[in-house]
Amino acid sequence: MDPTKNVKCVAVMKNLSCFVGYDSKEDIAYRVCKHSLLKRASMDIKIFSLKLDELVAKKFYNREIDPLASTQFTYSRFLVPTLMNYKGWAIFCDCDFIFLDDIAKITENLDESKAVYCVKHDYTPKDRKSVV
């Protein structure tokens, strides 16, 4: 019996696209996130900031501003598959992430049968009407 027979891991990735949610009120957080990602990456990575004004200008985003949205990228994070032309793997993270290890490690056990991986965290909205 071959224990690897049913394993569906992706071949070793050479590059990765990383989309970071950008909020103009958190520019420094974005810069720290980007720096920590680049500093520790052992693979080629392309980092894209999801800046709302740029997405609107390129006609990728035309939603009304939601006063209950907690960040400028509350909804634009869901554009990542479209921005990737529905091909390959990409990572999205909020701008307040600090990478303490190599991002390449996250790609080691990807399974081609999965369309999305996500991390759920405990969050209680301050306002019951919040979209988060």
What are these regions (language model features)?
Residues C9-V132:
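Glycosyltransferase catalytic domains, chiefly GT-A lineage
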